Amino acid sequence: MVSALNPRTTEFEFGGLIGALGISIGLPVFTIILNQMIRPDYFIKGFFQNFDIVELWNGIKPLRYYLGNRELWTVYCLWYGILAVLDVILPGRVMKGVQLRDGSKLSYKINGIAMSTTLVLVLAIRWKLTDGQLPELQYLYENHVSLCIISILFSFFLATYCYVASFIPLIFKKNGNGKREKILALGGNSGNIIYDWFIGRELNPRLGPLDIKMFSELRPGMLLWLLINLSCLHHHYLKTGKINDALVLVNFLQGFYIFDGVLNEEGVLTMMDITTDGFGFMLAFGDLSLVPFTYSLQARYLSVSPVELGWVKVVGILAIMFLGFHIFHSANKQKSEFRQGKLENLKSIQTKRGTKLLCDGWWAKSQHINYFGDWLISLSWCLATWFQTPLTYYYSLYFATLLLHRQQRDEHKCRLKYGENWEEYERKVPYKIIPYVY
């Protein structure tokens, strides 16, 4: 489908077809191996013992076992399905997203507070009814790798559904141009089945009132990450009768981050994931598998290899985390208020397109100062495991790579969009992410 609304994609990301295939196979395998490695028999004071990748992979059951396991599928589908129903029925304020290419704006229900409150209440009730045993958390901990594999398979099927559905015209409504044509992602309409399936063909796939992309971004993966962390804390306490300060710290740091993201979810509406990227395997796998099953790596590690930090290290790590939060939120708030016309005193560059490029306040320090704050937060999580193993620093390294890629994508887009105005902006704000470093 090629039209004025949906032109043919001519620029490919991630190495095109070969890169899409490599990531679609390599990242899931990497995620499974990573989770297989967090086992007591593979660690002595944080170092690998008798590491054998073949043995690790052989510890995974055949694919047909997971495809046909009704119990695992029931558990995961109930998790996704119940959250989807709650997302639709729980109250929340309705906000408009950014203007789309057809001139329309989609409506989004912002009900993160109601969703978070519901989850906390359910956990509290189950804690009371089971005398603190919480068999659901025990099941999650004991079937961690199996549920990881199920989430990957679910991501595959969800991406396939969204790809096929992208070819079906709008049925119950028309787009902003008065036609039945769906809006496709500019980067996902190449005509190559595998690449478009991976990168995401439809921009905003919806199933009735459910926006699949925004829901997947904020609900099943993020909240499962929280539960996995709690299951690690719960398992360690049941096993040893005590909890180490590092494990408590990781639960606090990441729990704070998760609830902050859910409670401030309206900020997602202007993120590239929502405004620009289609919803394909890349986002489905990232949201549903990579986030919960690799971001929880620190908690998983500390549940099998405890670390006692002491209050000095705890305070230092907290300071790094809150510094990151301050930079991240202050910078984002400043840019948001500037766009709303509340901070007209800040210096900016007037572009030929009629918009302004902010180059003052936080945004005089670097082009993506918010990325630096976000990365400091990620570093604090890894530091909670101290320097026992490089494995737990995976997230900080991965996140740095992700932020660099986003920065380069944004820079390429802005060069094309603003031309000489962007060159002037780069002269005034030369640093990309970290002031005086990069």
From Swiss-Prot:
Pathway: Steroid biosynthesis; zymosterol biosynthesis; zymosterol from lanosterol: step 2/6. It catalyses: 4,4-dimethyl-5alpha-cholesta-8,24-dien-3beta-ol + NADP(+) = 4,4-dimethyl-5alpha-cholesta-8,14,24-trien-3beta-ol + NADPH + H(+). Its EC number is 1.3.1.70. It is an enzyme of class 1 (oxidoreductase). Disulfide bonds: none annotated. Its main location: membrane. The keyword tRNA processing does not apply. The chain crosses the membrane at residues 14-34, 72-90, 110-127, 148-172, 243-263, 309-328, 369-387. It is a multi-pass membrane protein. Inhibited by the morpholine antifungal drug fenpropimorph. It is found in: Membrane. It holds the Pfam family ERG4_ERG24. Keywords: Lipid biosynthesis, Lipid metabolism, Membrane, NADP, Oxidoreductase, Steroid biosynthesis, Steroid metabolism, Sterol biosynthesis, Sterol metabolism, Transmembrane, Transmembrane helix. NADP(+) binds at K335, R339, L358, W363, N370, Y371, D410, C414, R415, L416, K417, Y418, Y425. GO terms for cellular component: endoplasmic reticulum; endoplasmic reticulum membrane. GO terms for biological process: ergosterol biosynthetic process. The keyword Lipid metabolism applies. Present with 1600 molecules/cell in log phase SD medium. Belongs to the ERG4/ERG24 family. PANTHER family: DELTA(14)-STEROL REDUCTASE (PTHR21257), DELTA(14)-STEROL REDUCTASE TM7SF2 (PTHR21257:SF52). This is Delta(14)-sterol reductase ERG24.
